[in-house]
C-alpha cells in the first residue's frame, strides 16, 4: 500500500464499508434486517463469486479517487443449511468446485443453522453419508483454501459478515 492511514482515517474508511449482496442471493432478511438495525450500508450487485463482498466508496480526502471493490479479493459464500451444502457437495459438486477454483484467495464458507456436531451426528435431512459429508467438508477446506464457519444461530450472520470484511480491510491497509 502507498498510504499509511492514521487511526482516525482508518475508522473513517471502515465506517464507509458497503456490503455487496449478490443479486441471486435468496432469503436473507435476517441479514439485511441486522444491517438496517445497525445502519450498515449495503447494496445488491451481481457478483462473479460468492454471495457477499464489499466496497469502499471514493474518498478524495484519503486518496481514494474511485470506488474500491473487493469482489475479486474477499468473498463470503453462504449456505442456509446442511441440506443446501449437501446438495452442493453431491448433485452440484462439479459446478461448486468450478466456482471455488475461480473464487478469490480470501474466502469463507458460512453454513447457517448448523454445527459440525450436526454433521457428525447426522442431524440433517439428506441421504448424504456422514463420513462422506465430513470428508468433503475437510477436503474442500484444504483443496480450495476455504475455511468453514458454522453459524448455528443465523441471527449472528450479519454480524459475522460485517466483522469479516472489517478485519480483512484493516489487515489489507496495514
Regions found by a protein language model. Give the residues of each.
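Non-catalytic C-terminal interaction segments of nucleic acid-processing enzymes
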Residues: 1-71, 83-174
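Conserved catalytic cores of phosphodiester-cleaving nucleases, focusing on short active-site segments
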Residues: 74-80
